[in-house]
Regions:
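Conserved S-adenosyl-L-methionine
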Residues: 4, 8-137, 153, 157, ...
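Mobile active-site "lid"/loop adjacent to the S-adenosyl-L-methionine
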Residues: 56-57, 164-196
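Hydrophobic alpha-helical scaffolding
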Residues: 83-87, 144-148, 153, 157, ...
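A Trp-anchored, charged/polar loop motif used as the substrate-binding/catalytic surface
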Residues: 129-148, 191-199, 241
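A short beta-strand submotif of the Rossmann-like class I SAM-dependent methyltransferase core
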Residues: 160
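Conserved Class I SAM-dependent methyltransferase catalytic core
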Residues: 186-248, 253-255, 259
């Protein structure tokens, strides 16, 4: 588990709960915008593969094996499943896990999800293109028609456990988000990463899309965060807030969290 910048990889039982609640389908696009080791996407793949095999009247396959996959299973992963993380080491782990899980690993992309205005600059680098070009090419196709930037996408499902320690202090990033403003509508000098991820994840969703995001419990309780809750309530239909035990991310952090 990685503790820098508040990154703590998500326990499997939390991932499984989120995947079952989101219930991704074979024809839906899914992304983890703060992927870490890509637990959400790997287990979503298993979930959909089981559904594909059930549809065909076949027994469930064995996960994390060299078992041969059907064309439908392979095509689902290549076309529909995406993951982004700013940490290149985490991305390498994710690509390895995805390869073990049986997918083509190409849609795990090393980018800063929040700093999308610099994506064009980053993606032109030769070394980056060698590793991530094909996945990025597929990602661009999921933007709304006519889009000329990377602010909005048309994903059906977004799942993420964004870093919840440390602040974003770069004005260039903060001013691209409504939640970069405080409760009085004034631009802030620093904003919690997880706060900006709320808005960013919603921008990844198409209308009617579904999201599961792990947030510090204080976002649901603190009076100073009421404007954040109002922002969410104005844009979403909240289906559940699931409180996680205080030990969920121990020994790395005792921060109380919930899944929205």
């Amino acid at each position: 588990s990685k503790g820098e910048k508040g990154q703590y990889f998500t326990p499997r039982y939390v991932i499984d709960m989120c995947v079952k609640m989101m219930n991704p389908k074979e024809d839906e696009y899914i992304i983890d915008t703060a992927a870490g080791s890509s637990g959400f996407t790997v287990h979503s793949i298993f979930h959909v593969w089981d559904a594909i095999r059930e549809r065909k009247g076949l027994p469930k396959g064995e996960n994390f094996t060299a078992e041969e996959r059907s064309n439908d299973e392979i095509k689902y992963v290549e076309d529909r499943v995406f993951a982004i993380d700013f940490d290149e080491k985490a991305v390498r782990v994710a690509k390895t896990l995805n390869l073990i899980a049986g997918d083509g690993k190409t849609n795990v992309i090393n980018l800063n999800t929040l700093d999308y205005s610099r994506w064009d600059e980053i993606t032109k680098q030769d070394r980056w293109q060698d590793a991530y070009f094909e996945g990025f090419r597929r990602l661009k196709k999921i933007r709304p028609a006519g889009a000329n930037d990377y602010k909005e996408f048309n994903f059906d499902v977004v799942m993420a456990n964004p870093p919840f320690a440390g602040d974003i202090k770069e004005n260039q990033i903060i001013t691209r988000y409504e939640l970069g403003k405080n409760s009085k509508g004034k631009w802030q000098n620093k904003v919690g990463r997880d706060i900006l991820f709320i808005e960013r994840n919603l921008n990844f969703l198409k209308p009617g899309g579904r999201m599961a995001i792990i947030l510090p419990q204080g976002r649901f309780n603190n009076s100073s965060d009421q404007y954040i809750r109002e922002f969410i309530a104005e844009r979403c239909r909240i289906l559940a807030v699931v409180g996680l035990h205080g030990n969920t991310f121990k020994p790395h952090t005792g921060t109380k969290t919930s899944v929205l």
